[in-house]
């Protein structure tokens, strides 16, 4: 991977030797950075920022100017696919994303088509191309999508939810309708991620934020089955290089063996699982990403370093196969200097594990 100045992240995902543990942060481009807030105010609103390739690239690169991160992640949103399907995405102040036309029945599912990644979603591909150009080979670029199940929760609920009653009603009363929707979404995600890879994404990640609200059997049937379909459909080699894929189910620690069996390269872990246990269970099959509680970034520097040391020790001295990250996105009111302490601690404290 000679064109990359720093390929630590990709090497760790492929379990190749690295000099120290690579690190990046979910939501590393975001509201905790004053420069992000300034750029967003220029764009006007969140989706305008996503749809402007130059500004999306600017906010993607902002955290890399502050911190020696080992990867950049595309600045976008998981709801781009349902938005492109015509559901009318909008953001209510203080309430998060909502849809004007949620999915309520089979007729609604029949109506939606698969968006063209270089048509309705071309703005995402333009952002990928712009970011790759602006990165100048410094670090790899991660592309991403929401999982079919997680996208479906927003589409059926009409926005965020705490109890997920609407989608669970569909799941138990009209399972065939939900499977039809999930199948369409899986096909869309495959096309979308493959287009990101062709546009320049060097690794991809599927975020299954709400898989953890399901029973074990429902998780297999309504979430994992469709992520497996995505893994099977992805371009796994591009431009002469392997394109690693990471699956992340929040609150999915009980299902690591099943997730590893999809053929993914890595599993993202949240903070509710001990990384030593995870490594014992599936470390021979996949790399692991995670898994510090993002709230620890509110602590004093020494406490942050202590937590980093604990997680590194838990993963052990295999020398590779671990990408350090938070267990979910960084909180918007974390002091940026604390994020810097975290990133520096990972690089410094992991070196003895990579001799």
From Swiss-Prot:
Q: In which pathway does it act?
A: Porphyrin-containing compound metabolism; protoporphyrin-IX biosynthesis; coproporphyrinogen-III from 5-aminolevulinate: step 4/4
Q: Which reaction does it catalyse?
A: uroporphyrinogen III + 4 H(+) = coproporphyrinogen III + 4 CO2
Per the entry, what this protein does is: Catalyzes the decarboxylation of four acetate groups of uroporphyrinogen-III to yield coproporphyrinogen-III.
Q: What is the lineage of its organism?
A: Bacteria, Pseudomonadati, Pseudomonadota, Gammaproteobacteria, Vibrionales
The catalytic activity of this protein is classed by the Enzyme Commission as 4.1.1.37
Q: Which GO terms fall under biological process for this protein?
A: protoporphyrinogen IX biosynthetic process from glutamate
List, alphabetically, the GO terms of the cellular component aspect.
cytosol
Site (described: Transition state stabilizer): 77
Q: Which gene encodes it?
A: hemE
| Matches recorded under NCBIfam families | hemE
User: Its family?
Assistant: Belongs to the uroporphyrinogen decarboxylase family.
- Annotated residues that bind substrate are located at 27-31, 77, 154, 209, 328
**Annotated keywords:** Cytoplasm, Decarboxylase, Lyase, Porphyrin biosynthesis
Which PROSITE patterns does this UniProt record tie to the protein?
Answer: UROD_1 (PS00906), UROD_2 (PS00907)
Q: What is this protein called?
A: Uroporphyrinogen decarboxylase
Q: What class of enzyme is it?
A: lyase
What is the native source organism of this protein? Photobacterium profundum (strain SS9)
